[in-house]
Amino acid sequence: MKRAVMLAGTLVAIWSVMPLVPVAAQGRTYVSSNCTRFAIRPSYILFTCADGGFYMTQGEWAGWHRYRAVGSALFHRNDCTPSCAGGTFHTMRGRIVLHDRERCPDAHRHRQVFTRAIITLDVRLLGHVRYRAHLQCLL
């Protein structure tokens, strides 16, 4: 009995000094949808925050889980020919897989966000073209 009381007291002492994990960190996983806000199952994701040259619209998600999200969308990509300012946007259907969950800093309420995307585009004459994108916490 004495041993059980000491064990319970020790556990309470340990738990009281442990840092608390925010509730948001334990639950849902978000993605930076437009470089300024988080979303779950967004229909729009901007992959290139600097110039807006690669983004998706009409996103539909077949699955959205803590560690992986899978969906399809229309992807719009600037060919940057002759330059990115004078380039042409091409639209293609494709699939997206979000993965690599990380916690954003305090300013973002410790939210868990997907930081990697694998995008497979259905390109005429070329078949499937795969891109990898790095997503980040909000700017």
Predicted segments with their positions:
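Short, low-complexity intrinsically disordered segments
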Residues: 1, 13, 59-62
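Bacterial N-terminal signal peptides that target proteins for export
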Residues: 1-8
